[in-house]
A protein has these predicted regions:
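Gram-negative outer-membrane beta-barrel transporters
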Residues: 389, 393, 401, 497-506, ...
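Short acidic/polar hinge/loop motifs at secondary-structure boundaries
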Residues: 105-106, 113-139
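Face-selective signature of the C-terminal outer-membrane beta-barrel domain
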Residues: 224-236, 273-411, 417, 432-434, ...
Length: 690
């Protein structure tokens, strides 16, 4: 039986007593509920799927940025811009690397409720990491079933409260004035469960003009009105009253002083003010022992006010909503074995976009006033079936429509009203060879679809060297790609995992950055691109409290055809900006004991290494950014009694004090966003069973 306490009087005795205190535990199984949009063990899914569990989320950082968790997954480039006005830069297999802010080309979902609007853009900062049970990432063709997402899907799932009533409080302090405070309350009984998470985050920022403040509420109510029907209500309120924007630096400015802000950002008080509220309701009902009906409906609002470096402001007031219905079952009848899934979705986002000149960071006029809308509908289905005793297959398809609209009310500078429509028919095939109880080999292929976002059609390119114009860009086509992946999943025992995946994606009409200046970015279509690479993920419990994990990615992301942009001629073979040639993450953890959920008991320590290769910052490949290697370490102690559960921990990052580039702004004259030098954080968390 697991011990409730493991008290070791001195750090020197910790390692000597590891054999006494260590709990022999297996790795927590990665049960995937999302790869095929129905519950399925990740080992059997014909897809590249990985998850980060709560035990890692709680110690990987201050639980502010999704990059804290995603950096340890293969195929995912998660860069903390250290700029809270623009959100982290996240790409999967190179999809989404073009994003100057927010997330593109990747679908975001929180507790089953979309966190991306119909056009495909989303804000990863809206995830409540403090109360998350796990983060799942789907890469490759099976993400097609989610619609407007080429690179993959990122889902967060809130933890399920333990029986009874409990409350917790936590605080984190760190370098550059970082402070995060959180209070949580949860309760669970036979009738349902309640989880409430309230947090506040502040930082002075490492760079000049990079202070930020954020407040967040996340609440989830699980209700059971009958033995066969469950309801979930998810409420979120995310408020960022200020986030200063230091913008990017030129390579010369970065070498001179990486802490400085970009040109004109201080004098013109460049910043962003954001507020978002959302309500979602989900229902799951067992119609029979083999058939389940699921439904969801959600609505929300987001406001965004941004002051830019070239004396301008942009304001957005967005309302969004959607609904979905899904039916799944274990069989289509006695003559058709396997399981089926069919669903329909309708989503809508309407925003009032205004803009104009600014004077010293305040509004000084209006020269843009319009309504933008993104409206999508989709029908999807899949059928998973056993082909032989060792072979299983999956066939799926998604059919969808998306309409982007612009109604211009400021006509003195011309009428930029317009409408564009996109249609999607995306098939996907998957095959799994169950070679043995411990080895699965899989392959999948599909045709993906990615539309431009409202933000990407909001500006049109101007003559070379000029700032993009405020014209609705109806010339952008949707990108269409064909993806193929092959891989193996090896589970020699309950204490070790190995995943190896090779992939290739060829895209036509790739949406790429054309111009980027002073907070405005315009886009265009490139004739063709290719992404191909290899991903490896390994995890092992070595016994005596030691665990290791590693993730390796090698990727070649290039233009397959020559293209001309306002920058000049892009040669075939040029690299896609912001995508490293390779990246790696490795960690070695030790804990004197673990509970049944894999979280440490008593003392713990970890050492992490992270590296990524060179990147280019522009389509012409004239600006190159060197790769880097980073080293992080953490130590903690957790004590548990009958009613109390408390943890103290400390973490240091970039121990060797490397000067490096965290992310790049594609095709920008000042593309460099610096990474943090050596920094630290310390935290305390206490939970009481009431």
């Amino acid at each position: 039986m697991m011990k409730k306490k493991c008290v070791v009087p001195a750090i020197g005795a910790v390692f000597l007593s590891a054999g006494v205190c260590a709990q022999e535990t297996s790795l927590i199984p990665e049960v995937v509920v999302s790869a095929t949009r129905v519950a399925q063990d990740g080992f059997d899914a014909p897809a590249a799927v990985n998850a980060v569990q709560s035990a890692t989320l709680q110690t990987a950082g201050p639980q502010v940025n999704l990059t804290e968790a995603l950096a340890r997954l293969p195929g995912v480039m998660a860069s903390n811009r250290n700029n809270y006005a623009q959100d982290p830069q996240i790409s999967i297999r190179g999809f989404g690397a073009r994003a100057a802010f927010g997330v593109r080309g990747i679908r975001l979902i929180a507790d089953g409720i979309p966190a991306s609007i119909p056009d495909g853009q989303g804000q990863a900062s809206s995830f409540a990491l403090g109360s998350a049970d796990r983060i799942e990432v789907i890469r490759g063709p099976l993400a097609i079933l989610y619609g407007n997402a080429s690179g993959g899907v990122i889902q967060s799932f809130s933890r399920t409260p333990a029986p009874g009533l409990s409350g917790s409080a936590s605080a984190v302090w760190g370098a550059n004035g970082l402070m995060r405070q959180s209070i949580q309350l949860d309760q669970s009984n036979a009738r349902g469960a309640l989880l409430v998470d309230v947090s506040r985050f502040e930082t002075d920022g490492y760079r000049e003009q990079s202070a930020a403040k954020r407040e967040q509420l996340h609440a989830k109510f699980d209700l059971r009105f009958s033995p066969v029907t469950d309801w979930s209500v998810v409420i979120s309120d995310w408020n960022q009253p200020y986030a200063e924007d230091p913008a990017g630096l030129t390579p010369a400015a970065f070498q001179q002083n990486p802490q400085q802000a970009g040109a004109n950002t201080v004098a013109r008080r460049v910043r962003k003010i954001t507020d978002q509220r959302q309500l979602g309701v989900r229902m799951r009902s067992a119609l029979s022992q083999a058939t389940t009906l699921e439904a969801r409906v959600y609505a929300g609002a987001r406001s965004n006010l941004q002051y830019q470096a070239f004396n301008a402001w942009v304001g957005l007031e967005r309302d969004f909503s959607g609904l979905g219905l899904q039916l799944s079952g274990l069989s289509l009848g006695p003559l058709v074995p396997g399981s089926f899934l069919i669903g329909v979705e309708q989503d809508r986002a309407v925003e009032r976009r205004q803009g104009g000149p600014a004077a010293l960071g305040e509004k000084a006029g209006l020269n843009r006033d319009e309504d933008n809308a993104a409206i999508s509908s989709g029908l999807y289905g899949s059928w998973a079936l056993p082909l032989t005793d060792q072979l299983s297959g999956l066939v799926g398809v998604r059919i969808g429509r998306l309409r982007l609209e612009n109604s211009d009310f400021f006509l003195s500078n011309g009428n930029s009203s317009g409408e564009v429509n996109y249609q999607q028919t995306s098939p996907v095939l998957g095959l799994t060879w169950h070679a043995s109880p411990t080895l699965n080999v899989f392959a999948s292929l599909g045709r993906g679809f990615e539309s431009p976002t409202l933000a990407e059609v909001a500006y049109a390119s101007a003559p070379s060297g000029a700032v993009p114009t405020s014209d609705f860009n109806t010339d952008l086509n949707a990108a269409v790609n064909r993806q193929l992946e092959m891989g193996l999943k090896w589970r020699p025992n309950s204490r070790e995992r190995l995943d190896v995946v090779a992939f290739r994606a060829k895209t036509v009409d790739e949406i790429v950055t054309d111009q980027s200046a002073f907070g405005r970015t315009s886009f265009r279509n490139a004739p063709g691109t290719i992404r191909e690479g290899l991903e490896v993920a390994h995890a092992k419990d070595w016994g005596l409290g030691f665990r290791s994990s590693a993730a390796l990615t090698w990727m070649r992301a290039v233009y397959s055809d020559a293209a001309r942009s306002t920058l000049g001629l892009i040669t075939a073979g040029n690299r896609i900006p912001s995508v490293p040639l390779h990246q790696a993450f490795a960690s070695l953890e030790w804990a004197s004991g673990r509970d049944r959920m894999g979280q440490f008991l008593g003392w713990s320590a970890a050492l992490e290494g992270q590296s990524f290769g060179t990147r280019v910052a522009d389509d012409l490949n004239q600006v190159r950014v060197s790769g880097t290697r980073l080293l992080h370490a953490s130590v903690g102690y957790r004590g548990v009694s009958d009613r109390w559960d408390w943890t103290i921990y400390a973490r240091a990052e970039n121990l060797t004090d490397e000067s490096y580039v965290a992310s790049v702004i594609v095709n920008n004259a000042a593309p460099i966003e610096p990474g943090l030098p050596r920094n630290w954080m310390a935290g305390l968390k206490m939970r009481l069973a009431l």
